[in-house]
């Protein structure tokens, strides 16, 4: 049920999603939805939280491991974002980006969850970059947190470019360029 609601929000955004549309997508009556979630906002917040949790868990799985494989994991992760974005032919984009852009200004719960997610993703990237530095794949004098913020911006940018219609080659070029400019020892 939550997956169907997430798909509806991903396709049409918060403002473009009605309770009738959610009821249709989930097969539940509007009364049941209001009873369970208090309304569209409550349901969106739950779906958004679960999406953010899954994004962080995926990044952690992608980037956790021994130091000698850290750069390979990082490269695979960056390239995977480009591949997944290119595969999104409907150009729905990322619910984290969509929800943040649409609601963070007016919904403090969404704003806080978005910031927490970005902070967690940044920390996961920082940890992997530090492993790359320990192993000798990246310059140990470089600021690992600054590199993590840069890569986080690149990853979010790849998703935005894909949503905007940039082709697969452009997305892969961004990913490869980001990896190429990381400071080597």
Residue ranges with predicted function:
Residues 4-42, 46:
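Helix-turn-helix
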Residues 1-6, 22, 47-51, 55, ...:
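Generic hydrophobic, amphipathic alpha-helix propensity
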Residues 29-36, 41-49, 129, 151-152, ...:
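A generic structured-segment signal
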Residues 73, 87-109:
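Amphipathic alpha-helical segments used for helix-helix packing
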Residues 76-84, 119-134, 154, 164-185:
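C-terminal peripheral helix-coil segments that are non-catalytic and often amphipathic
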Residues 56, 68, 72-76, 108-134, ...:
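Amphipathic alpha-helical packing segments from all-alpha helical-bundle domains
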Residues 92-97, 140-161, 173-181:
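Hydrophobic alpha-helical segments that form the core
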């Amino acid at each position: 049920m939550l997956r169907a609601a997430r798909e509806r929000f991903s396709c049409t955004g918060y403002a473009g999603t009605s309770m009738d549309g959610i009821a249709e997508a989930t097969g539940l009556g509007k009364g049941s939805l209001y009873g369970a979630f208090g309304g569209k906002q409550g349901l969106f917040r739950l779906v958004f939280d679960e999406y953010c949790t899954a994004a962080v868990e995926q990044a952690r799985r992608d980037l956790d491991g021994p130091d000698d494989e850290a750069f390979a994991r990082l490269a695979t992760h960056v390239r995977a974002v480009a591949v997944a974005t290119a595969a999104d032919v409907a150009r729905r984009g990322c619910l984290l980006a969509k929800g943040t852009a649409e609601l963070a200004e007016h919904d403090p719960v969404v704003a806080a969850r978005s910031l927490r997610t970005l902070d967690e993703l940044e920390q996961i990237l920082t940890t992997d970059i530090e492993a790359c530095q320990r192993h000798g794949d990246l310059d140990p004098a470089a600021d690992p947190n600054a590199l993590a913020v840069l890569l986080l911006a690149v990853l979010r940018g790849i998703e935005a470019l894909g949503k905007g219609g940039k082709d697969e080659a452009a997305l892969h070029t961004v990913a490869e360029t980001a990896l190429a400019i990381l400071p080597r020892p």
